[in-house]
Amino acid sequence: MVKVYTIASGKGGTGKTTVSVNLGTMLAQLGKETCLMDADIGMANVGLILGLQDVPVTLHEVLAGTAEISDAIYSGPAGLKVIPSGISLQGFQQADPEKIRDVMGELVKKFEFLLIDAPAGISRDGIVPLAVADEVILVVNPELSSIVDALKTKILTEVVGGHVLGCIINRVDQEKTDVITKKMEKVLSVPVIGIIPEDSNTRRASSAKTPIVIKYPVSPASLAIKQIASRLSGVALPEEKAPVAREGFVDRFTKVLFRKKA
């Protein structure tokens, strides 16, 4: 049975889209048929992150009624299927966000997991993704402004008939996780389903247009995202093996030298 999650945030800059991309990639790696749809039709970033910004058909054309959803599905990392939105203002103006309901009706027949990357903040375009998902996951930073805006998004979700599963706290100082978790659960009244630490490899992976769970699979952020994907899918993670360091020239030379002396 398909599970539809909308990934939302109360403000821009929380790392919501990066979380969506990596979570979708990890679900696909765990063997789940997964599709990530960029429903942020005004400020689309999924395509940019994955190098799909120049594809001929996007969600814009589908929502404008000039293309079929099957034409806007592209292959991403680890078998993840991706539906990017366009980056043109004209495409944004022609797209009807209400048609996302119809699009979902087609997608739920094809996948086990459908992730919807929603627009940040409270807007007309963001209401439908909050309402149509089985559950909404909030991406929050450990700052007061982000928490307050996430609370507004939670309230809006409930007003339009949606349900918030919980929140993912992103970019966290690892020494403060316990305090932040308690504060977040108290303010938002939802469980914390994952904590992603601040990780410099996130930016490096983004520059390479590659999800961090693939580029740096044992980095702190990757390990956190893998735990979240395991929790959502019910699939146990394979045991991580530490990378074996490659023997350098000096090491090889030293071995040969001492072998000869022996």
Where are these regions (language model features)?
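Short beta-strand "acidic-cap" motif of Rossmann-like dinucleotide-binding folds
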Residues: E33-D38, N45, L115, V139
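Short, amphipathic alpha-helical "lid/cap" segments that border enzyme active or binding sites
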Residues: V21, S222-A229
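C-terminal boundary of histidine-terminating zinc-finger modules
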Residues: A208-A224
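P-loop NTP-binding site
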Residues: Q227, R231-A262
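Residue-level signature of catalytic and energy-coupling elements of molecular machines
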Residues: G12, T17, D38, V62, ...
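Conserved catalytic-core segment of NTP-binding enzymes
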Residues: E98, D102, E106-A208
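P-loop/Walker-type NTP enzyme "switch/lid" segment
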Residues: M37-K109, S206-A208, I214
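Walker A/P-loop phosphate-binding motif and the immediately C-terminal alpha-helix
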Residues: K3-D40
